[in-house]
């Protein structure tokens, strides 16, 4: 069966909405913003390894979620950072998608991506340095650790989900 553009738009909208919900839900929103953050929604980055259209979905979800942050600059910087580094990460690590660590428990592509994307938090640390006058290295460190933790946990969840639900459509 051939997919329609409508189907693609709807699935992109659903993933973007899930990102927003997992970021802005009371309780989760308290840990989703600022120099120390743990965004549960970041696990949705891995949907892009199943279908590249989800790069747009996650970027849109990130930008909408960042409207709740303390500055509109975060909408632009966070959105562009997500678009660029998610695209690069999929391009660099997609070839490891079928390889695993720990007897098939941890997808290598997801693990390498988690490290790469955590390092990319320098963009958000720079933003916070200029907008909120936070110390760059400390902020980068806390952002990278939070990002890695959320992606590492999300890697297990999304890999298992991807084996049960066809995320490639």
Swiss-Prot record:
It comes from the Bacteria. The chain crosses the membrane at residues 9-29, 44-64, 73-93, 110-130, 137-157. It is found in: Cell membrane. InterPro entries: QueT (IPR010387). GO terms for cellular component: plasma membrane. The keyword Transmembrane helix applies. Its main location: membrane. It is a multi-pass membrane protein. Keywords: Cell membrane, Membrane, Transmembrane, Transmembrane helix, Transport. Belongs to the vitamin uptake transporter (VUT/ECF) (TC 2.A.88) family. In E.coli forms a stable energy-coupling factor (ECF) transporter complex composed of 2 membrane-embedded substrate-binding protein (S component), 2 ATP-binding proteins (A and A' components) and 2 transmembrane proteins (T component), probably with a stoichiometry of 2:1:1:2. May be able to interact with more than 1 S component at a time. Probably a queuosine precursor-binding protein that interacts with the energy-coupling factor (ECF) ABC-transporter complex. Unlike classic ABC transporters this ECF transporter provides the energy necessary to transport a number of different substrates. The substrates themselves are bound by transmembrane, not extracytoplasmic soluble proteins. This is Queuosine precursor transporter QueT. It comes from Lactococcus lactis subsp. cremoris (strain MG1363). The gene is queT.
């Amino acid at each position: 069966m051939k997919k329609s553009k409508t189907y693609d738009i709807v699935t992109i909208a659903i993933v973007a909405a899930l990102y927003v919900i997992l970021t802005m839900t009371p309780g989760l929103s308290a840990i989703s913003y600022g120099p120390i953050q743990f965004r549960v929604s970041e696990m949705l980055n891995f949907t892009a390894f199943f279908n590249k259209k989800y790069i747009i979905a996650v970027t849109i979800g990130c930008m909408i979620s960042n409207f709740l942050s303390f500055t509109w600059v975060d909408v632009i910087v966070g959105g562009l950072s997500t678009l660029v580094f998610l695209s690069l990460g999929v391009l660099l690590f997609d070839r490891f998608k079928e390889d695993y660590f720990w007897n098939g428990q941890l997808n290598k592509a997801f693990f390498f991506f988690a490290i790469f994307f955590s390092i990319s938090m320098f963009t958000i640390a720079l933003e916070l340095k200029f907008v909120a006058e936070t110390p760059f290295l400390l902020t980068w460190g806390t952002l990278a650790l939070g990002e890695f933790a959320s992606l590492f946990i999300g890697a297990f969840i999304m890999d298992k989900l991807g084996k049960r639900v066809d995320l490639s459509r």
